[in-house]
Amino acid sequence: MKDIIYIKNLRVQTIIGIFGWEREVRQEVSIDLEISFDCKKAAKTDSIEDTIDYKKITKNIIKFVEGSSFQLQESLAEGIAKLVKNEYKSSSIKLRVSKPGALRYAEDVGVIIYR
């Protein structure tokens, strides 16, 4: 059984989309992230140094997303995944990126990737 550290419904404004107006107006994206991580050592030591710092990873994701300008959610998701994998050396992650309200009649639309 693997342990999971997660961040759910992180909402960030960015330039994303293929239409002209989407290249000019920041839109909200929602991010869910699950990181496989062995939590045993952190549970034993009760030390932040032995786990993934939620605040730090959230700040890094926000900085990356706010500074990015992608046409596709797939590209944004891949960029976030690379950031997380490089920074935290996780064996695997599950990442969901969505654009709330992007499609009429749908709550949101997005992509889920596993790395």
What are these regions (language model features)?
Residues 1-115:
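N-terminal, polar/charged subdomain of small-to-medium soluble alpha/beta proteins
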